[in-house]
Curated annotation (Swiss-Prot):
GO cellular component, as recorded: lipid droplet; mitochondrial inner membrane; mitochondrion
Organism: Rattus norvegicus
Lineage, top ranks: Eukaryota, Metazoa, Chordata, Craniata, Vertebrata
Main location: mitochondrion
Full protein name: Phosphatidylserine decarboxylase proenzyme, mitochondrial
Record comment: activity regulation: Inhibited by hydroxylamine.
Topology feature Mitochondrial intermembrane, residues: 80-406
InterPro entries linked: PS_Dcarbxylase, PSD-B, PSD_type1_euk
Changes after translation: Is synthesized initially as an inactive proenzyme. Formation of the active enzyme involves a self-maturation process in which the active site pyruvoyl group is generated from an internal serine residue via an autocatalytic post-translational modification. Two non-identical subunits are generated from the proenzyme in this reaction, and the pyruvate is formed at the N-terminus of the alpha chain, which is derived from the carboxyl end of the proenzyme.
Record-linked PANTHER family: PHOSPHATIDYLSERINE DECARBOXYLASE, PHOSPHATIDYLSERINE DECARBOXYLASE PROENZYME, MITOCHONDRIAL
Length: 406
């Protein structure tokens, strides 16, 4: 009995020695000492310690807690900034926009939003079992305030997947098209900004601008594009204004996830050209538009250009996170959010052919395209100087309601 007990002790001692000398025990001990040391260090020293720690030790810390800590700290910082802004607003002080630095934009763009958006697109196409449809759609309706009484089909069981639910049609009487005004809202959404375009800079929100040429792309020299020839000394804005006495106007409409996701023709016009810019898929909510300069120029977008009765007219659908899919009903060659693309590239397609020398005629209110989720519509158009917007920044608007008129 004593001999057996002695052998057990020897075996335990030997196993303990082997464990202590094993790589796992060394890593465990190193990690434990590393974490213990971190608890006694101030924040700056902790960051320095993390940067100088062995790779194997950092791997054993597990990435999830590190990401949660980093993300939580950054979210807390952003919440503090928002709190400070609210306090300044209460005092009646105008808050200048605090733009993201170059490294913050680069860090955000490093997030694989295109891959995540493609994954979400695939997930949205998965057919849901009948028993799961009502709870899933009801949760979405409750979260984003969707008004299903406007839907052509109110029965949630009718929608086989999330994609069909996002692209649901409305009852004809739900969105009457205003016939008295020359330009109507192409979609449901929130008005971010509007007004005249000056010095080839366009406001994405108040105080934050983007380059008109970067957004629409360089003026092409082909005859079928709706850009008139201009001398090199003219600004890009002046190249778009085709008639004497006219001005260039813009309007930005943000579509939230709970909004109706289709967009329509805002006026009677002819679409002669499409330009597709592959790009990032960063969020385009008003907070991000206030934070990142030229956000719309970074993101994937589809620019439709043409003419209306007063000259140049364009509608741009801007993609966003989980909104990599932009569909134009009459453009079957358009494929957005492709796995690979060249930075700064764009694809042109002319709708002017020998058989159709004018382009695609669109009537006011006619269906034009759709998103898979909320995003942004940007209108840039030429009109006489007495064109007046009937809007307020920040107001909610529905498809068919008036944007402005002469």
């Amino acid at each position: 009995m004593a001999v057996a007990g002695g052998r057990g002790c020897v075996r335990s001692l030997r196993e303990g020695v082997l464990w202590r000398s094993s790589p796992c025990h060394c890593d465990y001990t190193a990690t434990r000492h590393f974490l213990g040391a971190l608890q006694k260090l101030p924040l700056q020293a902790w960051v320095r310690k993390v940067h100088t720690a062995p790779l194997r030790t950092l791997f054993l810390l597990r990435p999830v807690p590190i990401l949660l800590a980093a993300g939580g700290g950054y979210a807390g910082y952003r919440q503090y900034e928002k709190y400070r802004e609210r306090q300044l607003e209460k005092l009646g002080l105008e808050i200048p926009p605090k733009l993201a630095s170059h490294w913050e934009v680069s860090l955000y763009k490093s997030v694989p939003t295109r891959l995540l958006s493609r994954a979400c697109g695939r997930l949205n196409q998965v057919e849901l079992p009948s028993w799961l449809r009502r709870p899933v759609y009801s949760l979405y309706i409750w979260t984003f305030g969707v008004n299903m009484t406007e839907a052509a089909v109110e029965d949630l069981q009718h929608y086989r997947n999330l994609s069909e639910f996002f692209r649901r049609k409305l009852k004809p009487q739900a969105r009457p098209v205003c016939g008295l005004h020359s330009v109507i809202s192409p979609s449901d959404g929130k008005i971010l900004t509007f007004g005249q375009v000056k010095n080839s800079e366009v406001e994405q929100v108040k105080g934050v601008t983007y380059s008109l040429e970067s957004f629409l792309g360089p003026r092409a020299c082909t005859e079928d594009l709706p850009f008139p020839p201009a001398s090199s000394c003219d600004s890009f804005r002046n190249q778009l204004v085709t008639r004497e006495g006219n001005e260039l106007y813009h309007c930005v409409i943000y579509l939230a996830p709970g909004d109706y996701h289709c967009f329509h023709s805002p006026t009677d016009w002819t679409v002669s050209h499409r330009r597709h810019f592959p790009g990032s898929l960063m969020s385009v909510n008003p907070g991000m538009a206030r934070w990142i300069k030229e956000l719309f120029c970074h993101n994937e977008r589809v620019v439709l250009t043409g003419d209306w009765k007063h000259g140049f007219f364009s509608l741009t659908a801007v993609g966003a996170t989980n909104v990599g899919s932009i569909r134009i009903h009459f453009d079957q060659d358009l494929h957005t959010n492709s796995p690979s693309y060249s930075k700064g590239s764009y694809n042109d397609l002319s709708f002017v052919t020998h058989a159709n020398k004018e382009g695609i005629p669109m009537r006011k209110g006619e269906p034009l395209g759709e998103f898979n989720l909320g995003s942004t519509i940007v209108l840039i158009f030429e009109a006489p100087k007495d064109f007046n917007f009937r809007l307020k920044a920040g107001q909610k608007i529905l498809f068919g309601e008036a944007l402005g008129s002469l």
